[in-house]
């Protein structure tokens, strides 16, 4: 699924604190210290419900972190969705000529709910063999 020698996706064993924007900075520092060169900060990164603004965790890097204080590159991610037109996941603000019907949208909360109920997310979001592993995990977590 990824070209060889271009991307390394790894897990990071740190429990979420749900501390919002300041936790995003903490994640950047920890990952930088572990050798990461980039960090994707998504919508509502480390947030809980609607307590923090949807993009505050991205904004804090330009508003509160002095230039040059971090050696890790922050990638601010917008809303992501599967584009039916393009056949791939996209940042919604980066594609032209799309209407709401051209996207398949799922929130993380919705995906976890589906997995907990033994429902696989659409194949656009997860390979079936991965969805099976996740469903098994969430079903065990729910007991």
Predicted feature locations:
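Active-site cores that bind ATP or allylic diphosphates and position pyrophosphate for catalysis
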Residues: 1-143
């Amino acid at each position: 699924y990824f070209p060889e020698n271009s991307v390394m996706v790894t897990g990071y064993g740190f429990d979420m604190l749900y501390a919002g924007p300041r936790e995003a900075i903490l994640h950047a520092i920890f990952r930088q210290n572990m050798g990461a060169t980039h960090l994707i900060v998504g919508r509502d990164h480390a947030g809980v419900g609607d307590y923090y603004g949807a993009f505050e965790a991205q904004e804090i890097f330009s508003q509160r972190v002095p230039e040059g204080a971090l050696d890790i590159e922050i990638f601010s991610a917008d809303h992501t969705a599967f584009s039916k037109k393009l056949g791939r996941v996209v940042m919604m603000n980066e594609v032209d000529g799309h209407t709401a019907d051209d996207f398949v949208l799922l929130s993380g909360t919705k995906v976890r709910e589906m997995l907990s109920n033994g429902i696989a997310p659409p194949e656009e979001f997860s390979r079936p063999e991965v969805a099976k592993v996740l469903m098994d995990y969430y079903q065990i977590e729910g007991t």
